[in-house]
Amino acid sequence: VDRTLRGLLGMRPRAVVTPRADRPVRVRRETSAVVVGGGIAGVSAALVLAERGVRVTLLEAAGQLGGRLRAWPVTLPDGAVAQVEHGFHGFFRQYYTWRSMLRRIDPELGFLRPLPGYPVISRAWPAEDFASLPALPPVNLLALLIRSPSLRLRDLRHVDRAAAATLLEFDRTRTYARLDGVTAAELLDRLGMPDRARAVLFEVFGHSFFNREESFSAAELVAQFHFYFLGNPEGLGMDVTADDHGSSVWAPLGGLLDRLGVDVRTGAPVDRLERTAVGWRTVASGGSTVDAEHAVVGLDPTALRRLVTASDGLPAPLRTRVAGLTVSAPYAVARFWTDRPVRADRPVFSGVSREPTLDSITVYSRLEDGARQWAGRTGGEVIELHAYAAEDGLTAADAASRMWTELGGLWPEVAGLRVLHRETRVGHDAPGFPPGSDASRPGVRTGDPTLLLAGDWVRLPFASALMERAATTGLLAANDVLARAGARAEPVTTVRPRGLLAR
């Protein structure tokens, strides 16, 4: 029945790049690429290129690969070394491209575990968990209307039908033409949802893209609602790594890159690019250089703007487009090691609604092996609190204190815990998607076929987001290099490209 419904509704993965069987797998001529940025986008590009015979140098400014999925060690007061990360990341099952990269280190993805659920909690309303909804659209939407106390069938009488229809009519061209000049807040106002539904269904979802509703494109919100819910045949279930991201993801990927012959250099920031007779030269502050025929740049918007400003020989339209890129509101992450655990029935991960600062809670000692071992040895707990769109100017220490206080209002037993150690940070490098930004947003291609861009901020002709958008743009950049060298493209798959009611 499920297979029949998927066929009738067109709810199945769709190929957006199909390799030509008459092209060779490996490049026909010797060629090279320098990849600037060792996050998901850059590593995805480097991995595919190296597999196909391209000589690759990968340059990463930080001391570890990973970008915003990076992990790094800290020493706790008891002398134990723990790994901390940028924040919780869910590996959704429609992340087809990112998962295809990860299958190169484990075809069975055995290092991923299903997250049992992820309720949205608040002080105002009972917790609500959406992970158990049926996977298949629109059955998932019907089940939501039947099951959810936040949005009941009778509430639909007061909802603006035209605004609601936009959620089911996603079309990459029409949706952005109609809604990219509108804020997500304005669209939600038009919808006229009950306050609880707006808070629990939409605001929590929107915050997970690190953008505030008043500065987030309504078209981007609709695209992501399509990608995760209304066009996604895999459902809202997600997986998490069995251990920290460094151990589960980056150590194996780094080892694979080494075996493929990639020259991986961490702690290697690039100051500028220079055009050469045969391609591109990267120049570091100390003067070291790397020459290659192709350059794939997978940096965050701020780092990319800085690189483009310092570089000569770049296409003028690219300079203009990159200058218009923005970052979103700052995000804050705080990880706490405590002397005792929280209640045993607390979920591993919770979204949080309507707190001033706190957006999510993760009990890492019930999620990742390293944190679980520390908790088992000490009797404590490892808890991470995350603010996805914090106020400007908020310090890491203040954010941590606020979020801990807000957690106490949601989980009262927290007041009795003693914090043994905490690690705090504020980041300001997540991409912004403000209204009106789509038309000028850079794509993978720059106007120079030897210079390509990749990242979770890059414009795509189909809906995608976060880790999957980063991996997909990296793969598309690699495909352009492969095409120039006469090799077969790597396949790219995504969700149904258009909404159920798209005309």
What is each residue range found by the language model?
Residues D2-A21, P73, R346-R503:
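Conserved flavin/dinucleotide-binding core of flavoenzymes
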Residues D2-R14, R29, A268-I383, Y388-L394, ...:
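Mid-domain catalytic core of redox enzymes
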Residues R28-L58:
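N-terminal Rossmann-like FAD-binding beta1-loop-alpha1 element of flavoenzymes
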Residues A41, Q64, T302:
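Conserved Rossmann-like nucleotide-cofactor binding loop
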Residues A50-T75:
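Glycine-rich FAD pyrophosphate-binding loop
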Residues P77-L112:
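Conserved FAD-binding subdomain of flavin-dependent enzymes
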Residues W98-R99, R103-I105, L109-A218:
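Mobile amphipathic helical/loop "lid" adjacent to a hydrophobic cofactor/ligand pocket
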Residues Q224-A284, V290:
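Helical element adjacent to the flavin cofactor pocket in flavoenzyme catalytic cores
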